[in-house]
Amino acid sequence: MTVSRRTLLGLALLPLGCDPGKPHEGFLGLTERLNDRMQRALFRPGKLAPEEPAGALTPKGEFPLYKVADDYSAAPAGWKLRVHGLVARPLDLSLADLRRLTPTQFRVRHHCVEGWSAVASWQGVRVSEIARLCGADPRARFVEFRSFERGYPNADASPVRYYSSWDRESVEHPQTILAYGRNGAPMSREEGAPLRLYSAVKLGYKMVKWVDEVVFQPVRTGGYWENLGYEWFAGV
């Protein structure tokens, strides 16, 4: 899966004379920025994705679970979620701490950039609740979610951390959560345990698995796939 994405991206960039390592330069970068602006203009923070019926759940084993590392990542000993950046109160939250916060759940259709979709139920805490707890500064218009997963975006490069940056409006959408459960059961390692980002308003590659850091920041950064030319906003 990872190889095919990189291969297709490289082939797409060759006719444009663009460097796959510098997706924000040249014609491709201009097109992507215009697309992001259009998607942000169309985004409605209060609009919810429709709840799918219970019978629509995709059977276990038929919901693809992607990774960029050689194996599914295991949480390091003493794992905690670190929340920092432009915040009044930096946080270090254990899974037990997160479970004590007001829970939310929804059953929605997941959309992948490859064209497939699937339905799952997700349980967790809204990222807007985390923003409230840490006192996120209004100047932090972007949020970066970081994973302890490491992958190889380029064959000749060192492993890099999986991450994705988001616009603050999408982060605080009521269907954007840090999920610790799926389909009524605790999140499995393959699904992103102990904690993964999930949202009904973004494409799948924006939903970082194995999250260990949330950073509120004033500037937009990139992401593991975004740095390879994938859309930054990636709205559904």
Task: Cite the ranges covered by each PLM segment.
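N-terminal secretory signal peptides and thylakoid transit peptides that target proteins
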Residues: 1-16
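Structured, non-membrane catalytic/scaffold regions adjacent to prosthetic-group chemistry
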Residues: 20-236
